[in-house]
A protein has these predicted regions:
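A non-catalytic, helix-rich entry segment at domain boundaries
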Residues: 1-23
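Short, structured coil/loop segments at alpha-helix boundaries
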Residues: 4-8, 73, 82, 152-155
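Generic detector of short alpha-helix boundary/capping microenvironments
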Residues: 12, 30-31, 71, 143-146
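Mg2+/Mn2+-dependent nuclease catalytic core
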Residues: 20-134
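Polybasic (Lys/Arg-rich)
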Residues: 121-159
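Short functional micro-motifs and their immediate structural scaffolds
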Residues: 163
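Short cysteine/histidine-rich zinc-coordinating motifs and their immediately flanking basic loops
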Residues: 166-170
Length: 170
């Protein structure tokens, strides 16, 4: 391929489970008393280093070329890093570089004819899962707190919930 990835699909007896929503790659975190999981799309193994490569598939349909530059796509990057962390937590050696296989539907060709074509772009991403452990600690602390924390003014989800509460407050 034009991405020149020196890897082949990884074969593992749990691969189908790893891809299944609500099952996925699981890590029993005995230190915190939690089961963390995430459903991956694909895993490759590098032919030289033998490190695993996480591949995540994305699909969209837009006129512009796909990339990972939008602010909201930090969620995609965090998702990739979490998958890398899960696999490492299960004892696998995982490459920091993962791949997004981004499919962009060509609906702007002015013809449909019962089929849809895609442009496929391979986007490398060098993950860094250093944020995960401290985030899990904060998450556990929040869950165990007696007092609910104040909404974060920079959190779009918090803003959304506040608007719902205002709209339904009688």
């Amino acid at each position: 391929s034009e991405a020149n990835i020196d890897a082949i699909p990884f074969q593992h007896e749990l691969l189908d489970q790893w891809r299944f929503n609500f099952k996925g790659v699981q890590f029993e975190d005995k230190k915190r008393g939690f089961l963390w999981f995430g459903a991956i799309d694909d895993v490759w193994i590098h032919n030289q280093s033998k490190k695993l490569i996480i591949a995540d598939y994305k699909a969209t349909s837009k006129k512009t070329e796909v990339n990972l530059d939008a602010d909201w796509q930090i969620a995609y990057k965090r998702q990739m890093e979490f998958y890398q962390w899960l696999m490492r937590s299960n004892g696998f050696e995982v490459d920091d570089e993962g791949w997004f296989v981004y499919c962009n539907g060509k609906v702007f060709d002015n013809h449909f004819n019962g089929s849809l074509s895609f442009d496929i772009k391979m986007i490398p991403y060098k993950g860094n899962d250093a944020w995960i452990e401290p985030s899990l600690e904060r998450l556990i602390k929040c869950l165990n707190a007696i007092v609910i924390p104040d909404a974060n003014e920079n959190c779009n989800y918090c803003k959304y919930i506040n608007k719902i509460n205002l709209a339904t407050d009688f």
